[in-house]
């Protein structure tokens, strides 16, 4: 009988992997394993048995073959920056670190498309694109060290750019859990000239891609993808609207969005505004805490991009529209002198949660989508809940990226790892998530404990999902336990 991931089988796996990809690319030093055992989240750490670092598609295929043969679970990792336990391995599991696969393979400047490997970070893609007069779309809350490919795969439709939508990844190469290489969309047809064309009307592209969106490494390894880049404009300006009345937030956001002018748009509550628009000085956390009470309840921030004359017209149109509803277009945030400079820099090279975690040492996130109208209600409920359990409302940050249809919301609770807060926050997490679900929050990416919350309410959907998992990954070697809280299929 073969027992999943026993020490003997893992030893054999290490031996085979070392022969296939070189022993310097199979890491077993305890200090290095420890680094991969945890993330910024509240998820309990788990030490991997080894880290394998393949450098090519063929090497990944070999690793997958051995994992199947020896029933060793593997967890793909591209940037390693996700923060809800997505890359924490199961016992005796192996980390498949794809950072060595970090090449931009091709670019079509006229089409604004680049073909990238999973190890390409946002910073790298941004620098590469800028040399060709283009820019990469980066989500403001992520660190620039996140993998562009893995993030685009994971975010749609959680994150969206108000002007460009959420599907930035068009066609891709996937290594299925049995090692089969699959190309989606036009890439599947070598004779077709434009390998990146994504056609929703075709079952070969959109439909196929969706199976791997947000699959958290459970259905295969994405080894390449064509991603959209955008032009660099002559003029880029940042603007702000401050809002103190919850009832006006939806109206303001909608009016600005519906003009279809802003290219990047983010809404912050006062806590996240303080964290976002403050410089990372040694005093960062302390200064932030002092700032929060003096800031407006909400800050709506957006960029306008285009030719000088075009931007001028947009500015006057938006200013007029806002004036009509009693608001002003600002080019700075009162009390935050560097807001403009920081916003323009963050939309290209984001600092992400490592910066915000400096406020109280750590920060946990509840990501969901909801109607923009419901945001203030959910926010108030969360603040009350947090206060009832002895936390300050100054620890509750909210960042929203509005898209055409919904608000994409990240509720962030800052906490301190050194005092007894960790257990308390961990215990509250599920309860808060459940309460917010009742109020209209939808967890479109049910990570970790949220999987239980969501799938227990959608039995039929969950059964079909498990059927897909069983069909594609009969040995259950690909990042087990991510789609469910148990290892059973
Ligand atoms: C507004 C916002 C909110 C966010 N909220 C959260 C959040 O709440 N929790 C969170 O964890 N992240 C969150 N993210 C991060 C994001 O969704 C991705 O998890 C992250 O950007 C992935 O980048 P990474 O390179 O660090 O991936 P990694 O940390 O390396 O991996 C992320 C997940 O994808 C899988 N994976 C990685 N590479 C591949 C690959 N090549 N093929 C197949 N599977 C792969 C991994 O196994 C893992 O499950 C948020 C981002 C934004 C912008």
What do the PLM-derived regions correspond to, one by one?
Residues 41-42, 46-47, 72, 79, ...:
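Conserved glycine-rich FAD pyrophosphate-binding loop
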Residues 26-30, 53-54, 74-78, 96-98, ...:
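General beta-strand structural signal in soluble alpha/beta enzymes
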Residues 248-284, 375-391, 425-432:
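Short amphipathic alpha-helix segments
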Residues 236, 242, 291-329:
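A conserved active-site cap/scaffold subdomain adjacent to cofactor or substrate pockets
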Residues 13, 17, 67, 252-257, ...:
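Short amphipathic alpha-helices in soluble, non-transmembrane regions
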Residues 104-107, 116-256:
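FAD-binding subdomain of flavoenzyme oxidoreductases
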Residues 1-65, 82-112, 147-155, 275-278, ...:
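N-terminal flexible segment immediately upstream of the FAD-binding catalytic core
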Residues 57, 245-247, 304-311, 371-375, ...:
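Helix N-cap motif at beta-to-alpha junctions
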């Amino acid at each position: 009988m073969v027992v999943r991931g026993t020490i003997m089988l893992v030893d054999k796996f290490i031996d085979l992997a070392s022969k296939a990809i070189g022993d310097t690319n199979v890491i077993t030093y305890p200090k290095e394993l420890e680094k991969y055992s945890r993330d910024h989240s509240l998820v309990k750490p788990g030490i991997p048995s080894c880290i394998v670092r393949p450098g090519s598609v063929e090497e990944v295929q070999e690793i997958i073959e051995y994992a199947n043969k020896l029933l060793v679970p593997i967890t793909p990792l591209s940037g390693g920056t996700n923060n809800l336990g997505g890359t924490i391995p199961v016992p005796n599991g192996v980390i498949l670190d794809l950072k060595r696969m970090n090449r931009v393979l091709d670019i079509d400047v006229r089409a604004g498309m680049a073909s990238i490997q999973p190890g390409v970070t946002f910073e790298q893609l941004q620098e590469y694109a800028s040399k060709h007069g283009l820019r990469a779309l980066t989500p403001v809350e992520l660190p620039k060290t996140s993998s562009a490919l893995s993030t685009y795969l994971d975010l749609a439709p959680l994150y969206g750019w108000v002007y460009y939508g959420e599907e930035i990844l068009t066609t891709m190469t996937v290594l299925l859990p049995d090692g089969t290489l699959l190309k989606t969309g036009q890439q599947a047809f070598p004779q077709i000239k434009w390998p990146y064309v994504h056609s929703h009307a075709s079952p070969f592209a959109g439909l196929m891609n969706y199976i791997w969106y947000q699959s958290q490494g459970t259905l295969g390894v994405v080894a390449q993808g064509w991603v959209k880049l955008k032009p660099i404009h002559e003029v880029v300006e940042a603007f702000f609207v401050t809002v103190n009345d919850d009832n006006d937030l939806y109206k303001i956001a909608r009016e600005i969005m519906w003009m279809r002018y802003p290219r990047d748009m983010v809404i912050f509550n006062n806590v996240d505004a303080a964290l976002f628009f403050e410089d990372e000085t040694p005093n960062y956390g302390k200064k932030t805490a002092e700032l929060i009470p003096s800031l407006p309840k909400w800050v709506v921030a957006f960029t306008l991009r285009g030719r000088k004359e075009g931007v001028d017209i947009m500015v006057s149109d938006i200013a007029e529209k806002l004036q009509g509803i009693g608001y002003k277009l600002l080019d700075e945030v009162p009390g935050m002198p560097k807001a403009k400079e920081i916003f323009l820099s963050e939309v290209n090279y984001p600092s992400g949660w490592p910066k915000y975690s400096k406020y109280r040492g750590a920060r946990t996130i509840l990501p969901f989508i909801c109607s923009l109208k419901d945001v203030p209600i959910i926010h108030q409920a969360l603040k009350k809940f947090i206060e009832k359990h002895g936390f300050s409302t100054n620890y509750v940050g909210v960042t929203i990226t509005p898209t055409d249809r919904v608000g994409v919301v990240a509720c962030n609770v800052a906490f301190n790892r050194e005092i007894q807060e960790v257990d308390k926050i961990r215990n509250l997490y599920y309860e808060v998530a459940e309460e917010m679900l009742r109020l209209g929050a939808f967890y479109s990416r049910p990570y970790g404990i949220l999987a239980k919350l969501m799938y227990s309410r959608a039995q039929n959907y969950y059964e079909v999902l498990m059927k897909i998992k069983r069909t594609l990954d009969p040995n259950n070697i690909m990042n087990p336990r991510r789609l469910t809280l148990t290892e059973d299929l």
